[in-house]
């Protein structure tokens, strides 16, 4: 509550859910997107500020928005292209949550150069770290469904693909053509 956070790929499916949820908890959300088309979408789903990382340096913009203080946490599902600048957005003892590779596999992190100077925390969680039992998975799922049911989180399907078009869906995902949740149906 009351924190400002950065979420990369804010207009994507995970981003849309995260940004709404964070805003409902009282956070100020800064989101990044890769096109002007996605700015409006990210704002619709809870971002207070949106940065097109193809037009401006998101680290510089975040530092400007925070009066050079930096952020307590960054959530990054993009990966390779954003990791180093994301670490630069963090304030002293900030936390970097790296959970995806949309731009490619992460390079090794130079702990002495990128982590140690500010005493940062870097984590790379997967769903298995939070839902190791069926009960934990059910509990986490129920929390999401409660947020959807209450209207705090709205989920709109961006596109439906038939199973025979699964390869097209994958290409669209890799090409960043998907603006929100997409599903494949039989």
Question: Where are the model-predicted features located?
Answer:
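Terminal helix/beta-alpha structural elements that buttress the NAD(P)+-binding lobe
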Residues: 1-186
